[in-house]
Amino acid sequence: MTYSLAGQTITAPDTGGHGLDMSHGQDWLVEDCLIDLSACPLDQLDEAVGVVWGSSAVFRRCVIRGAGKLVLCGSGDTDKLNVERGKTVIFEDCILEDFGRRGPEAQSGMRIMLRGCLIRNWGAPDRFDVRSFASWAHHGGSIEAVDCVFDQPRAWRGWHIMVRDWLAHLGQAWNDEGLRGLLRPANWLPGVCRGLVATAGGQVRAENCHATRWWIRLEGHRGPHMSRSQAQALMARLENMR
């Protein structure tokens, strides 16, 4: 059975702290929805969207914004690995913006496909908790981005955030891979630079994508990049969805 949601606006979390909680093997189709948790205190939130425990989802023409942790695909629970492995979450013509991290994050063997999406302003100062990144795959998760734009308004977020973020990423690298993780140059990147990255057994792939800043890292990119004019046209088209 597929659960459908269309034309809805979500501005507050459920009792579990999620804007939209997809779990227990549910399949979802979400179209033309706004999930905006920017008015909610971070301590009242978990993810804006969580797709876990054997669920899958397709998002079309949605705007998801304003959470510390935006989109998590895969719970990381070892007892759920068998039901999560191979499940797919697709984002088509979506905007993911103004968040701290997980825009999106894939783990536990889950697969994310980004098609014609805008990922913008991760590590937003008012949504930052412990570290920041946009799209991250690890522990068997994978992310494929095609025709997407990764946009950051600025690199510097203040000493307090930058130092906390950098130390938290090094701590995560140590927790995931030990000394080997600390020896990987990519693990020393500040979060604001992490547009599309994979560590600790994750995989990422990109085609015809564009980073608006030279310092935004897009790993696994194959073939020519989207031009600046094409990126501006895509962003304008997506903005017209609002």
Region spans (language model):
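Short, charged low-complexity linker/loop segments at the C-terminal edge of domains
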Residues: 156, 212-215
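Extracellular structured ligand-interaction cores
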Residues: 46, 59, 91, 101, ...
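A generic "binding-loop/recognition-motif" signal
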Residues: 16, 26, 55, 100, ...
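Solenoidal tandem-repeat scaffolds enriched in leucines and small polar residues
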Residues: 87, 110, 122-123, 141
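All-beta strand scaffolds that present successive hydrophobic residues in beta-strands
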Residues: 3-7, 28-32, 57-59, 89-92, ...
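Feature marks extracellular polysaccharide-active and adherence modules
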Residues: 6, 11-13, 23, 31, ...
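Extracellular beta-strand/beta-solenoid scaffold signature
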Residues: 13-22, 41-52, 66-83, 98-105, ...
